[in-house]
Regions:
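Nucleotide/phosphate-binding catalytic cleft detector across ATP-hydrolyzing
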Residues: 1-155, 161-271, 276-277
Length: 279
């Protein structure tokens, strides 16, 4: 494995690890469970995610990355150690790593990412803004002299960028993403149906029937939770329109941020490239 390059996505929702020549070798929820008494790591990734809302007082389930930045360096280090061991048995093995980070984070936050990754046996760490990584992953040719807009909806952050000639011309981010949409659905279910649901149920509903605008053919989904009035198990059938209504205010915030980034792209800049802006 010596000399192998890797790419890491330290997402608020998922941890992804790409190894050159092998492809994506890890794609799991970026969650870790810790025993409070012994400070021992109990589970990482999918196993830890399944413990959300089901653990005892002793076990704490934590997301080491929130809002696109590392919120717990110790647990992020434990997560990195866990996954890097999956691809090698040596602590000193990979000279280079590329790590995707939100475009709007501070220099201090960028340094924290570099330090966390470098502490796990990687000699050289390069950071790449999320919109650039997303564009390359989507197969966009960002070397061409026209603008391409990329919107990356993460769990904690929506990252927006306009790319041209191998650089990020204009960017912006907003702390609204999948986690906020889930919370919107949780609040909506409680407010409208007196139904208490958890994060995993909200996530499933969002993925199944969530929409930013009304669908031509309305879809339905069954929410299962607990009746707030009597504490008994309950279920309610909701439509895609209702889930869209629940998320509407947050979706509008993202749209407004996209508009502000577009407005920051000067007409002169576009004319200089003799082309139009492609979304």
């Amino acid at each position: 494995m010596a000399g192998t390059d890797i790419a890491i996505d330290l997402g608020s929702a998922n941890f992804r690890l790409y190894v050159d020549g092998k492809g994506v070798v890890v794609d799991e929820p970026n969650v870790i469970a810790v025993d409070e008494d012994s400070n021992r790591v109990v589970a990482v990734g999918r196993r830890a995610y399944k413990m959300l809302g089901r653990t005892s007082d002793r076990v704490r389930v934590v997301k080491p990355v929130t809002g696109g930045v590392i919120s717990d360096l110790t647990l992020m280090d434990a997560t990195l150690q866990h996954y890097l061991k999956k691809v090698t048995n040596s602590r000193v093995f990979m000279p280079r790593a590329v790590v995707a980070v939100p475009s709007g984070i501070t220099e201090v936050e960028r340094r924290a990412v570099v330090d966390a990754v470098a502490a796990n046996g990687i000699r050289k760490v390069c950071l790449i803004e999320t919109p650039v990584a997303a564009a390359i992953g989507a197969g966009l040719d960002i070397s061409r002299p026209h603008g391409s807009m990329v919107v990356k909806l993460g769990e904690g952050v929506s990252d927006i960028g306009v790319l041209s000639m191998n650089r990020l011309s204009v960017s912006g981010s907003i702390a609204v993403g999948g986690a906020v949409f889930n919370e919107d659905i949780i609040k909506y279910a409680r407010r409208k149906f007196d139904l208490i649901i958890g994060e995993q149920t909200a996530e499933a509903a969002k993925c199944a029937v969530g929409c930013a605008f009304p669908l031509k053919d309305i879809e339905k989904y069954e929410l299962r939770g607990r009746d707030e009035r009597n504490g008994l198990p309950a279920k309610v059938e909701v439509t895609s329109d209702e889930i869209g209504e629940a998320m509407l205010e947050s979706v509008v915030k993202v749209v407004h941020k996209i508009q502000s980034v577009l407005e920051a792209v000067s007409y002169t800049h576009l004319r200089a490239h003799e082309t139009s802006l492609h979304l």
